[in-house]
Amino acid sequence: MSTKKKPLTQEQLEDARRLKAIYEKKKNELGLSQESVADKMGMGQSGVGALFNGINALNAYNAALLAKILKVSVEEFSPSIAREIYEMYEAVSMQPSLRSEYEYPVFSHVQAGMFSPELRTFTKGDAERWVSTTKKASDSAFWLEVEGNSMTAPTGSKPSFPDGMLILVDPEQAVEPGDFCIARLGGDEFTFKKLIRDSGQVFLQPLNPQYPMIPCNESCSVVGKVIASQWPEETFG
């Protein structure tokens, strides 16, 4: 049993008329044919002809594709579909971001040591400021600013953590050889290095070869794992 196709409205027919007129005007300039338009749209040539001739109605998807191919705005041939696309955009833009952002406090290196799991005498109210990231970490995580160039890798090598870069430290994540970490070397001396194991011994390795490796012995304790890095916003003015 066949069903009779619903005829296009006057508005849809006007859209098709305007679309075809634009195509006829621009096809030579853009080097287009119905066949090439069909290829770009991923449909048959007869389907394109049906859109141009008002046999099949345009929809938002096809209108957007044709606007891109003809290098015009959708509104130039279909004001109603242009409104529809705009309303769809508005609805999407009002939705919460798919990538959540999390804020963590920025501490000084001294505060970072006091924030280690066994001490933790500083509170987040002592933060110098708060910085957001899409990286999810524990509630104990905090930012530190890299000091010096011991973690600046040679040119062309990655990763590299130049002076002034922010690193996100999570005291609740386990640190394994190969991880970057903040370690306490005794007293209030802290260092940012890569933890490595060599010949059964654990070392703190700088990325800058001009600096020596540091043995991680009984006076060395890990404060937290470095899980992310980024430049402060003020770096870019």
From Swiss-Prot:
Pfam families: HTH_3, Peptidase_S24. Keywords: DNA-binding, Latency-replication decision, Repressor, Transcription, Transcription regulation, Viral latency, Viral latency initiation and maintenance. GO terms for biological process: latency-replication decision; maintenance of viral latency; negative regulation of transcription by competitive promoter binding; positive regulation of viral transcription. The keyword Transcription regulation applies. Residues 30-49 bind DNA. CDD domains: HTH_XRE, S24_LexA-like. GO terms for molecular function: core promoter sequence-specific DNA binding; identical protein binding. Residues 19-77 form the HTH cro/C1-type domain. InterPro entries: Cro/C1-type_HTH, Lambda_DNA-bd_dom_sf, LexA-like, LexA/Signal_pep-like_sf, LexA_repressor, Peptidase_S24_S26A/B/C. It comes from the Viruses. Acts as a transcriptional repressor that allows virus to establish and maintain latency. Prevents both the viral DNA replication and the exit programs. Clamps the two operator OL (operator left made of OL1, OL2 and OL3 sites) and OR (operator right made of OR1, OR2 and OR3 sites) together by binding to them and arranging the intervening DNA in a loop. This step allows repression of lytic pR and pL promoters by binding to OL1, OL2, OR1 and OR2 simultaneously. Bacterial cells harboring a lysogenic lambda phage are immune to further infection by lambda. The cI repressor protein inhibits the lytic development of any additional infecting phage particles. The region of the genome that codes for the cI repressor protein is known as the immunity region. Homooctamer. The DNA loop is maintained by octamers of repressor cI. PANTHER family: LEXA REPRESSOR, LEXA REPRESSOR-RELATED. This is Repressor protein cI. It comes from Escherichia phage lambda. The gene is cI.
